[in-house]
Amino acid sequence: MHLSDFYFDLPDELIARYPKPERSSSRLLRLSGENGDISHHTFSDVYDLINEGDLLIFNNTRVIPARMYGRKASGGKIEVLIERVLTESRFLAHVRSSKAPKAGTELILGEDKLGEGKGVKAVMIGRQDALFELEITEKSTALLDILQKIGHMPLPPYIDRPDEDADQERYQTVYSKIPGAVAAPTAGLHFDEELLAKLKAKGVNFAFVTLHVGAGTFQPVRVNNIEEHHMHAEYVEVPQQVVDAIVATKAAGKRVIAVGTTSVRSVESAALAAQEKGFAQIIEPFFADTSIFIYPGKQFRVVDCLITNFHLPESTLIMLVSAFAGYKNTMNAYKSAVENRYRFFSYGDAMFITKNNHVKGLD
């Protein structure tokens, strides 16, 4: 399979730079993986597509204000985007500057928010491949508390605008709980408290995994043969409660519905690990890094339906959707979405997809 197989032409004006005023007022494209049928809805209509006894798997990670602006103590401007928090004071980050900082370089961060001369001091410890390990030298305040004061919401590059106060709420799911992500699990942005309450009252079950989405999710695939691509690693937690809920749902003949590709990658990583260890049960608890890469031909052991946003051309996420719904079905659905002026990417519209059980490649 070639990278270009997953290209589609997207007019720039269809990239959503701001969210809709109401979360559940986004549009929803329903795609049948079985026969490729497409229908058009409002996201709140998802209530009618989910049945009593079905299980929704949410990712409860919370986005941290992970982007910081500052300068080297010697004067040069610098931008820091956290990839992963290591300790209360240390983190791995992407760093942009005219010249890469060396070990021992002192940085002053956050003067744009705190005022000149009042920034937070940090030091460059070393490098791990493309990432820099940094340490805040002020140890009396926890890193997450410091980020609340000097950090900016890490909006994706394609949104192409500075973050605003409203993004603190809207680039966050209403059920987010555990801080650590530097990108939102965007399918969940469409759920508001009212819709969640209605689904709960209908008898729909909820379960929560944690995958702290890294900035690597926006890194382009750089190989033509997609099978040569290596995914970045992200930390996943699939606790026993989620395992029990999935097993009970399957036993009852109901559906497991993943809210977002991160939820898919979480539970499918846990299921793959269970299979590789020879467990009889379909899935076992999982607390580890995952670099699972799902593309057409890969099997889904757990997920029956997927709620997801529209993804970038040639991205690993459109490959995952193609593996789930079938390549031709997926590309036809994206063509329909463009023709019908759907909004794309993180602040855009969504899809509700039922699984195609017969995907073997580019079908």
From Swiss-Prot:
First-tier enzyme category under EC: transferase
Main location: cytoplasm
GO cellular component annotations of the record: cytoplasm
Localisation per UniProt entry: Cytoplasm
InterPro entries recorded: QueA, QueA_dom1, QueA_dom2, QueA_sf
Assigned keywords, A-Z: Cytoplasm, Queuosine biosynthesis, S-adenosyl-L-methionine, Transferase
EC number: 2.4.99.17
BP term (GO), one: queuosine biosynthetic process
Catalytic activity: 7-aminomethyl-7-carbaguanosine(34) in tRNA + S-adenosyl-L-methionine = epoxyqueuosine(34) in tRNA + adenine + L-methionine + 2 H(+)
Molecular function as annotated in GO: S-adenosylmethionine:tRNA ribosyltransferase-isomerase activity
Role, per record: Transfers and isomerizes the ribose moiety from AdoMet to the 7-aminomethyl group of 7-deazaguanine (preQ1-tRNA) to give epoxyqueuosine (oQ-tRNA).
Matching NCBIfam families: PRK00147.1, queA
Family: Belongs to the QueA family.
Protein name as catalogued: S-adenosylmethionine:tRNA ribosyltransferase-isomerase
Native species: Mannheimia succiniciproducens (strain KCTC 0769BP / MBEL55E)
Lineage per the UniProt record: Bacteria, Pseudomonadati, Pseudomonadota, Gammaproteobacteria, Pasteurellales
